Amino acid sequence: ILASDFAGNQESWGTWNKNPPPKSALKVFPFDWSSEKSWTVLPEFPETIVLTIPPLLNDPPAERIRLNQWCEWMKKNRTNIKRIIYISSTGVYPKRNGLWHEESEFEPDTNSGKLRLITEEILAHFFKLHVVRPGGIYGKGRGIDLRLKYGKHILVSRTPVHRIHVKDLAGIVFHLLKNPDSVSCINAVDFDPKPSWEV
């Protein structure tokens, strides 16, 4: 969705890792966040990166070291990149009763939540950072059928899950790209929660 919005901008580009995206007018190239050799393919001219890659390592201390190494490399070798819009997750919030918002202080109670929060903290240390914390993402290319196809774990629960349509998420990111002085953290959910198997 964002690719079509920015395809006409010569300074816009995208990356892919395992599976090339559908053909688009947007310039794209392969990128492996885990390999320093791959970092050099990142262009030098943009000011903002939209980062959608999830944490790579399951061990929080090791992921912290890896992220710091990447950020240090970026500050030294890609000095024009000043801002990152990071797609995190509402999974950073504890799964217990309580009221949580963007400025709450909390400790995630899942490893994936801890890894996401570590990523947010480290990126904020090196860049001007906008964090978008979406709920479960649904819409074209995001259904349960695809998760089953790729062997992803599906939690079956009757508890409603906060979610957001992929087009609405893209709209939020587009707004942040065009408005660099917007808020630094957004919980991105709609008003139509569903059980986990419908997300």
Residue ranges and their predicted role:
Residues 1-9:
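N-terminal Rossmann NAD(P)H-binding glycine-rich loop of SDR-like oxidoreductase domains
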Residues 137, 143-146, 155-177, 184:
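Substrate-positioning beta->alpha
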Residues 172-175, 179-199:
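Mid/C-terminal beta-alpha module of Rossmann-like enzyme folds, strongest
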Residues 71-109:
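Conserved Rossmann-fold NAD(P)-dependent oxidoreductase catalytic core, especially the SDR/UDP-sugar
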Residues 120-140:
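Conserved beta-loop-beta element that borders a ligand/cofactor-binding pocket
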Residues 25-47:
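Conserved Rossmann-fold cofactor-binding substructure of NAD(P)-dependent oxidoreductases
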Residues 42-85, 118:
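NAD(P)-cofactor binding segment of oxidoreductase domains
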Residues 10-20, 32-33:
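N-terminal Rossmann-fold cofactor-binding loop
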